[in-house]
Amino acid sequence: PYRRQRQMCIRDRINEIYLCKVKQSALTKAGKPYDTLILQDKTGTLDAKIWEPGSVGIDEFDSLDYIAVMGDITSFQGNLQLNVKRVRKVQEGEYDPKDYLPVSDKDIDQMYEELKGLVASIKEVHLKKLLESFFVEDADFEKRFKFHSAAKTVHHGFVGGLLEHSLSVAKHCDYFAGCYPMLNRDLLITAAIFHDIGKLEELSTFPENDYTDDGQLLGHIIIGTEMVGDRIRTIPDFPKGLASELKHCILAHHGELEFGSPKKPALPEALALSFADNIDAKMET
């Protein structure tokens, strides 16, 4: 029953239930009120407008409500937009929440097994123990990591997005390690798997998928470095220099200060990770 936005055409009549991700009121240049909506189902999001809020057939609802919408597809500045004619808030039982979350096209359990295969390939005992403490021995962490997105909107902003992105970056890094023998593969792969772990605390879970207070104040790079540092302290005799190198790779993975990294890459592994991260983010968008 779901049509992706790219499959919709101008003048199509839409009669569907959506999650209202965002609802904002505004005024036209003439001073007339209207509502801007972002509607979501598992295929993605759709911009919508209610040009006559409060009119007959336009019921009251808020952001994060599930709503039944009837309207027509139009075009605005080259993008499809839904002109809403009727809307009502639906009741529980009329919808299944999981149908309204964008989900990775790839098999989530299969991706996680592939990620655990990379964990198993790590030879350095302290790095392997650190990875296993999260990805093998912590069932709650596994559930969260499989479900979470990698971003609010920029890239991999869907259920399984964090896992898909982390695995892809780690695979790029595995390739780099095979091409360039000077790279420490164990350090690079470990950093790749961990690089966006802070997204678990930076972004709230679906359906909100929005920035938390810590996300706004600290950001995922600092949060992730702290998460890894806290766990390192539970592992006996973890080499101090290795811990610093791993944390540096996480801190520097955006590559440049203006892109949000508090440090620029000072290790070849940090540089390789920043390239792998940038490639995967750009290719997904």
Question: Where are each of the predicted segments found?
Answer:
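OB-fold single-stranded nucleic acid-binding module
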Residues: V22-P33, T45-D47, P53-D99
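Short, glycine/small-residue-enriched coil/turn segments at secondary-structure junctions
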Residues: R11-E16
